[in-house]
């Protein structure tokens, strides 16, 4: 979804001067000048201007086929999620020492680390202020719960990387539920809070969040498009314990080659190609594809149970069709 710049109003429209003539106040806050606003939001605006899959916005619209929330409330929720998603990407790129995002230099390589962190933090609070436009009295509590979940998940992923600890599959799936699932869940919980429907779509959204992350892990190591947008096998350079990497390492407990490649944080293409071949040899890409297909089928079953006799599930099914990857036959491993 493309949003206009004024969808994120940082300047105040109604201004009241107090005793200090050089300052302008609005709702207890000192209002920014236009120049100040552009400086503060520059890293965020830079990222938001780049092409994006915008799957969270599309999924919000798809679920709203069931919930029938008024469009003005849907736009508020989309605005909140867009701000949080892009702010989290700014921070992720710093924490992961990334070089590319969506095919261009990461924001902190343009604006610096300090200014990028400040812009991301500001976005969290601008998003929080948008909650005032919703009617659900629990909106603020839901917002806090899911942002705490997101940071807990991110913290565990950082811990595994920095301590070179390979998590179990179950540990990784729990982390996904918190980190990746957080914004998916926040959007739908806020949407449900504005709806007259009593149906609960959180379980379906949890499945979709897990599906999205595992598919992203797979594509990072297998997709030419991902290589162009983020760099070749960037997850290996970051030292990330992604889903196929975890399966590969744990399928051969005595083989330390892959975990040592992660330790090096190598940018050498040949080293990363060797790692990809190793992951392939353990059947981990096939395992990942089969997991993706299993999650797609699980989501379709959950959708059918929610749909009953209505035909509201078409947009969600379209999203699932796009996320599906044809399973591979089991290959012979070394």
Curated annotation (Swiss-Prot):
Pathway: Secondary metabolite biosynthesis
Note describing how the cofactor binds: Binds 3 Mg(2+) ions per subunit.
Binding site for dimethylallyl diphosphate: 101, 179-180, 213, 220, 230, 240
Catalytic activity: isopentenyl diphosphate + dimethylallyl diphosphate = (2E)-geranyl diphosphate + diphosphate; isopentenyl diphosphate + (2E)-geranyl diphosphate = (2E,6E)-farnesyl diphosphate + diphosphate; isopentenyl diphosphate + (2E,6E)-farnesyl diphosphate = (2E,6E,10E)-geranylgeranyl diphosphate + diphosphate
Pfam families: polyprenyl_synt
GO molecular function: (2E,6E)-farnesyl diphosphate synthase activity; dimethylallyltranstransferase activity; geranylgeranyl diphosphate synthase activity; metal ion binding
UniProt-annotated binding residues for Mg(2+) 1: 92, 96
Site (Important for determining product chain length): 124
CDD domains in the record: Trans_IPPS_HT
Keyword Metal-binding: yes
Annotated residues for binding of Mg(2+) 2: 92, 96
Binding, Mg(2+) 3: 216
Record carries keyword Transferase: yes
Cross-referenced InterPro entries: Isoprenoid_synthase_dom_sf (IPR008949), Polyprenyl_synt (IPR000092), Polyprenyl_synt_CS (IPR033749)
Any GO BP annotation: isoprenoid biosynthetic process
Positions annotated to bind isopentenyl diphosphate: 53, 56, 85, 102
Cofactor: Mg(2+)
Keywords: Magnesium, Metal-binding, Transferase
Protein function: Geranylgeranyl pyrophosphate synthase; part of the gene cluster that mediates the biosynthesis of lolitrems, indole-diterpene mycotoxins that are potent tremorgens in mammals, and are synthesized by clavicipitaceous fungal endophytes in association with their grass hosts. The geranylgeranyl diphosphate (GGPP) synthase ltmG is proposed to catalyze the first step in lolitrem biosynthesis. LtmG catalyzes a series of iterative condensations of isopentenyl diphosphate (IPP) with dimethylallyl diphosphate (DMAPP), geranyl diphosphate (GPP), and farnesyl diphosphate (FPP), to form GGPP.
Family: Belongs to the FPP/GGPP synthase family.
PANTHER family the record matches: GERANYLGERANYL PYROPHOSPHATE SYNTHASE (PTHR12001), PYROPHOSPHATE SYNTHETASE ATMG, PUTATIVE (AFU_ORTHOLOGUE AFUA_8G02400)-RELATED (PTHR12001:SF70)
Protein's recorded name: Geranylgeranyl pyrophosphate synthase ltmG
